[in-house]
Amino acid sequence: MSQVLDARAGKITPEMEKVAADEKVDVEFVRAGVAEGTIVIPRNTNRKVLKPCGIGRGLRIKVNALIGTSSDRDDRQMEMRKIAAAEAAGCDSFMDLSTGGDIDEMRRLTLAHARVPVGSVPIYQAAIEAIEKRGSIVAMTPDDMFAAVEKQARDGIDFMAIHSALNFEILERLQASGRVTDIVSRGGAFLTGWMLHNQKENPLYEQFDRLLEILLKYDVTLSLGDAIRPGSTADSLDGAQLQGMIVAGELVRRAREAGVQVMVEGPGHVPLNHVETTMKLQKSLCGGAPYFILGTLATDVAPGYDHITAAIGGALAGTVGADFICYVTPAEHLGLPTEQDVKEGVIAARIAAHAADLARGNRQAWERDLQMARARVALDVEKQISLAIDQEKARSLLDGTGEDGVCAACGTNCAALVAARYFGMN
């Protein structure tokens, strides 16, 4: 049985109970959301997730971190340190995007070390192995693609980004209209090259039922990869992107009918005036499926600060519909991230998620902000630190900054102290 089929049968699973307790909502609310497809709980039947999370309507916005080796840097111990740094910073899930070294071993290490759900992009491994065995990505076979999905599912991957919502109709629209940045999704580029070279339809689209059978077998959550997400603000909301949303919506319905949990990925670089339209279109076209967004990067001109551009766009996107934010680090567009980059990316995404949760009326978010406000008025340093999104940084700045009962920033002229003294406010 899958989470979806259990939910439709009226059964409440241990994962649903954990999500409900964490979110402080009724477990029946979670069960109903899983049953109708507006909530997913990534969890492979071959893996015990110590900290499961629910993603979707009525729940807190979650944050995903990326790790993985590459041909330029195959340092598995560094990736383990990144996992520790990201979990300490409060991420809700990981995706292993490894393309270098022993990909199987890296995945198994990630699954063993991470306490949260772990995702992957199987087409990466299929493509790299095609290069190693046959000299070219376009030499992949459909069986190679599905074998990678099966192997990673068997190992315990909880959710997979799979670019099924890409077909020749979308590519023809893209070629006819043109783009500044064409295709920036790596998986999308691999498949596009394969399709155009071989003049064959995307197997992950054409044989979608075959894919669903594998995912259902292990209760892997399908994350419909956004193969043609905009790579620049100039390309946002073009015809190809909209056609991709329509196809994704059709596949969401088929996945739900098969009993497979499914969410949809987007959007990349999106100017702020396009964010609300993008979110509402996706929710409408995809039947309210959870929306998993990269960023959203609100401008193209801030290399070195793209964790900030992504937090700006991500906060707005979360406010109007996004459910799951994939972090962006300061190294985006510049190089491979360090452990510190990973931490800063998670913190920035968590700030965006929390700000959006406030705007959405999430009670836990509002209670946390209220407690922080009270702690500041009371000059309760320890309470302020415990409530901070980045507790380590808050402690480094607040510890030893002044006497007890004296504001660290304002001293004896603190507005809160003056107000309390003369107006009896506290």
Swiss-Prot record:
* Cofactor(s) in the UniProt record: [4Fe-4S] cluster
Instruction: Write down the EC number.
Output: 4.1.99.23
Superkingdom of the organism of origin: Bacteria
Q: What InterPro entries does the annotation carry?
A: ThiC/Bza_core_dom (IPR038521), ThiC/BzaA/B (IPR002817)
Q: How is the cofactor bound?
A: Binds 1 [4Fe-4S] cluster per subunit. The cluster is coordinated with 3 cysteines and an exchangeable S-adenosyl-L-methionine.
Q: Which residues bind substrate?
A: M95, Y124, H163, S185, R186, G187, D226, A227, I228, R229, E265, F292
Q: Its GO biological process terms? A: cobalamin biosynthetic process; thiamine biosynthetic process
Which keywords annotate this record? 4Fe-4S, Cobalamin biosynthesis, Iron, Iron-sulfur, Lyase, Metal-binding, S-adenosyl-L-methionine, Zinc
Which reaction is this enzyme known to catalyze? 5-amino-1-(5-phospho-beta-D-ribosyl)imidazole + AH2 + S-adenosyl-L-methionine = 5-hydroxybenzimidazole + 5'-deoxyadenosine + formate + L-methionine + A + NH4(+) + phosphate + 2 H(+)
Q: Give the matching Gene3D superfamilies.
A: Radical SAM ThiC family, central domain (3.20.20.540)
Signal peptide region? none
EC class name: lyase
Residues recorded as binding Zn(2+), renumbered to this chain, are H269, H333
Which one of the record's GO molecular function terms can you name? metal ion binding
Record-annotated disulphide pairs: none
Which residues of this UniProt protein bind [4Fe-4S] cluster? C407, C410, C414
Purpose of the protein: Together with BzaA, probably catalyzes the conversion of aminoimidazole ribotide (AIR) to 5-hydroxybenzimidazole (5-HBI) in a radical S-adenosyl-L-methionine (SAM)-dependent reaction. Is thus involved in the anaerobic biosynthesis of the benzimidazole lower axial ligand of the cobamide produced by M.thermoacetica. Requires BzaA for catalytic activity, as BzaB alone displays no activity.
Q: Give the family from UniProt.
A: Belongs to the ThiC family. 5-hydroxybenzimidazole synthase subfamily.
Supply the name of the protein.
5-hydroxybenzimidazole synthase BzaB
Organism for this UniProt entry: Moorella thermoacetica (strain ATCC 39073 / JCM 9320)
Name the lineage.
Bacteria, Bacillati, Bacillota, Clostridia, Moorellales
Q: Which gene encodes it?
A: bzaB
